[in-house]
Structure formats: structure tokens, C-alpha cells
Regions:
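N-terminal organellar transit peptides
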Residues: 1-137
Length: 137
């Protein structure tokens, strides 16, 4: 955790506590926490719903919402002719700064190809808000 994070200070204790709990289940660091794993996207009425749940991290698998998984889901949704629009379903306190600009740029580019929006499904702060704002909806 030697990276700069953009999230509310009070969330730092929660993130650290969850990481500490992984000490008793180190395999979770490799496989990821099942309840937080990205599921790609779900197509609902022609809308690709991409979940962004938990702290935003660089790579999916060990914790939170991986920027790589969100970017991959975004790319797949753009290529899917059944997806007329893209919705980021966000419940996140924010996360790492590194890589967020690149993902934000990808979201901004996506909105030039398909209608994009973000839904703050609870907390949407810091780096998560940055990503949401790139949809402009």
C-alpha cells in the first residue's frame, strides 16, 4: 500500500481493517474477495451496467474495484452491439490515484461512442467521483 489514495480519511481505517482481515485468509489476496469481484457487466434493457464497487485499485483480484476490470468491461460494452448505453453503477469511497486518469480518459472517450452515465449507488467519493464525472451524466 505504498501508493497515493484518493478517498475520505474516515474510509482509510475501514480499508486497512479489511486488508488486516486478509491476514487470516491470505489466499483472498490472490483470488480476491468473492463479494467484491468484478462481474464484467450485466445487460439490462440494452444498457450495459458496469459495477464499480469498493475501493478503486489498479488490478482486480486482491481488493475492491480493479481499474483493469472496469476498463475491460467498458471496452467489451463498447464492442457489444446489444449495449445501446453504458451505466457505471458506483458504490465506492475512491481509491488509488495512479491509473485513475487513464480510466477517466477511457470513460470520456467511451461517451463519444455510446451514451454513458454514472449512478451513485451509495458512496461515490474522490477517485470514484472523478470517474463518474467523466460520463457527464
Amino acid at each position: 500500500m505504498n501508493e497515493l489514495w484518493a478517498l475520505p480519511f474516515e474510509m482509510a481505517e475501514q480499508v486497512l481493517a479489511e486488508l488486516d482481515s486478509a491476514k487470516s485468509n491470505p489466499q483472498a489476496l490472490v483470488e480476491g474477495f468473492p463479494e467484491r469481484k468484478a462481474r464484467g457487466y450485466e445487460l439490462v434493457g440494452g444498457v450495459a451496467v458496469i459495477p464499480v464497487s469498493g475501493p478503486i485499485v489498479r488490478e482486480q483480484g486482491w481488493y475492491g474495484a480493479g481499474q483493469d476490470a472496469v476498463a475491460s468491461s467498458l471496452k467489451a460494452a463498447l464492442a457489444d452491439p446489444s449495449a445501446r448505453a453504458i451505466l457505471l453503477d458506483i458504490t465506492s469511497p475512491g481509491g488509488v490515484v495512479a491509473g485513475t486518469k487513464e480510466l477517466a480518459d477511457a470513460i470520456a472517450e467511451a461517451r463519444t461512442k455510446k451514451r454513458c452515465a454514472a449512478y451513485a449507488n451509495g458512496l461515490c467519493a474522490s477517485a470514484a467521483y472523478w470517474l463518474a464525472s467523466c460520463t457527464r451524466r
